[in-house]
């Protein structure tokens, strides 16, 4: 079937976190979910499950593992065992559990910044010391990794590197040679790797996602990979995710940390949606990726032509645009407050992603094009005043 992503869907009365927190005259483009209807096979599967009417405790059918293993093999040529999969209610719970499983209180954790705020908070949540390495921004907005700085930041007590790939908020899809260099440094310094790869299916311009655990067996042995259908198929409110942990001892430590804190099974509707999405959601994904790529190109062209002083490097993955507003001569130097007040457009504050995000905002372009253009027009008009 053909999906209509231009359709305007009113989410205001649906307890949407994105739409509920702002006044009705504000266009919200912050929180990373889509303003699109999810795949029809997912909706159909949920409808059938709801009509059954019984919502007791669930378990995983063998078909689930078959579908998930086939998905990983098809998309990433990644062959794993069913035993390596651990079901979770979300990736945030996953990387907090990974911190507990991989390091003891007082240990160090390494991150590349700017970075998704819950990842920045994770070390403090579990008594670890966070060490941030700033990604290097080129004149055109493109970010690269300073590998010398990365290695120099490793301390004797550092135990974990927390990777975000595709990277939120900058939109980099790290190439194989970059991942190999990071992994080599981690192995040389005896670091485990926690990889948040939740945006792995949202890719543009023939970029290819390489799960870091697929590099070789030694890397896989020290890695916890976290994935979810939530970004890919717009299922964030259903809380369904999974970890892939090849090392049995590490997997047991991870499972032990969730005991009686994080349930071993996702909710029954989340499980139903996840199975249907990975089994039958490919056509929807193909179509939404084309729409998102067009939206990304719209934002890129608009920024260059109509938002003076704003720099955007087109994201290689994710549906998030990281806008550098430091040269836009915004009064007070706070683009988040400025666009909210003057343009009535809500974006993510770059400072939430760390001190490296000062003067930046993050814009979510996973919405109907007419809404996106409306927001950009408002931002243009605010800058011209």
Predicted regions span which residues?
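Conserved PLP-anchoring active-site segment centered on the Schiff-base-forming lysine
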Residues: 101-123
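N-terminal small-domain helix-loop-helix segment of the aminotransferase-like
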Residues: 2-90, 97
């Amino acid at each position: 079937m053909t999906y209509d992503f231009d359709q305007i869907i009113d989410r205001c009365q649906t307890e949407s976190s994105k739409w509920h927190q702002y006044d009705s005259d504000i266009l919200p483009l912050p929180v990373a979910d889509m303003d699109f209807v999810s795949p029809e096979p997912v909706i159909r599967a949920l409808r059938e499950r709801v009509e059954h009417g019984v919502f007791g405790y669930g378990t995983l059918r063998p078909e689930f593992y078959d579908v998930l293993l086939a998905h990983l093999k098809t998309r990433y040529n990644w062959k794993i065992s069913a035993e390596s999969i651990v079901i979770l209610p979300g990736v945030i719970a996953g990387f907090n559990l990974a911190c507990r499983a991989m390091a003891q209180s007082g240990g160090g954790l390494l991150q590349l910044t700017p970075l998704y705020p819950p990842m920045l908070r994770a070390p403090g949540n579990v008594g670890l010391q966070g060490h941030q390495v700033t990604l290097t921004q080129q004149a055109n907005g493109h970010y690269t990794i300073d590998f010398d700085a990365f290695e120099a930041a490793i301390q004797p007590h550092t135990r974990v590197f927390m990777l975000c790939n595709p990277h939120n908020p900058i939109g980099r899809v790290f190439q194989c040679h970059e991942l190999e260099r990071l992994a080599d440094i981690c192995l040389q310094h005896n670091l485990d790797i926690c990889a948040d790869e939740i945006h792995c299916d949202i890719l543009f311009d023939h970029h290819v996602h390489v799960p870091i655990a697929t590099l070789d067996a030694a890397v896989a042995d020290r890695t916890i990979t976290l994935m979810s259908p939530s970004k890919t198929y717009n299922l964030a409110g259903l809380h369904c995710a999974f970890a892939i942990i090849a090392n049995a001892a590490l997997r047991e430590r991870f499972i032990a940390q969730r005991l009686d804190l994080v349930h071993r099974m996702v909710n029954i509707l989340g499980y139903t949606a996840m199975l249907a999405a990975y089994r039958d959601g490919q056509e929807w994904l193909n179509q939404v990726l084309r729409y998102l790529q067009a939206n990304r190109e719209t934002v890129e062209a608009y920024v260059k032509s109509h938002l003076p002083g704003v720099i955007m490097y087109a994201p290689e993955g994710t549906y998030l645009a990281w806008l550098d507003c430091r040269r836009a001569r915004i009064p007070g130097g706070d683009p988040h407050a400025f666009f909210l007040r003057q343009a009535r457009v809500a974006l993510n504050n770059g400072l939430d992603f760390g001190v490296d995000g000062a003067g930046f905002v993050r814009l979510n372009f996973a919405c109907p094009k007419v809404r996106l253009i409306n927001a950009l027009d408002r931002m243009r008009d605010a800058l011209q005043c």
